[in-house]
């Protein structure tokens, strides 16, 4: 039996239509929503040092959890997440492997707490300069963020 053009068209539509409706009814993919970063800055050390620290506010406006699991920059040999804590009156720093940000919440990277540790700048950075640090998210996406070098907190 040979199909006439209108019958063939109807067959294609009736085959594809359920799949198109199914795809259209799917919830938005997590990739549609990204955390937002505000107030990103790097503290310029008083003297040339092989390490610097980066700070910012990371907000998750999405309906699903997000997590920062790493960072990188072309301006530094290594970038990692760290946390400073007071233990028995002594300030201790430890690396943080995963920084969760709950839906509708924010996390502050600030002096004396969570921060980005920036090791080995490839060239000296001056106050007012800007450089990009890319945050790596747990779902495999990358979030490039522009950081401004400052002598003190904004």
Residue positions per predicted region:
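Initiator methionine at the very start of the polypeptide chain
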Residues: 1-3, 30
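Compact, glycine-rich, soluble single-domain proteins
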Residues: 31-154
């Amino acid at each position: 039996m040979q199909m006439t053009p209108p019958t063939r068209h109807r067959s294609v539509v009736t085959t594809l239509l359920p799949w198109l409706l199914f795809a259209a009814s799917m919830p938005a993919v997590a990739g549609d929503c990204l955390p937002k970063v505000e107030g990103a800055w790097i503290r310029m050390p008083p003297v040339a040092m092989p390490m610097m620290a980066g700070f910012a506010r990371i907000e998750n406006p999405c309906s699903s959890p997000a997590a920062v699991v790493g960072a990188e920059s072309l301006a530094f040999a290594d970038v990692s997440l760290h946390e400073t804590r007071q233990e028995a009156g002594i300030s201790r720093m430890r690396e943080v492997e995963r920084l969760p940000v709950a839906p509708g919440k924010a996390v502050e990277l600030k002096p004396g707490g969570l921060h980005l540790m920036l090791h080995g700048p490839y060239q000296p950075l001056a106050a007012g300069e800007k450089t990009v640090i890319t945050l790596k998210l747990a779902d495999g996406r990358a979030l490039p963020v522009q950081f401004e070098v400052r002598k003190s907190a904004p």
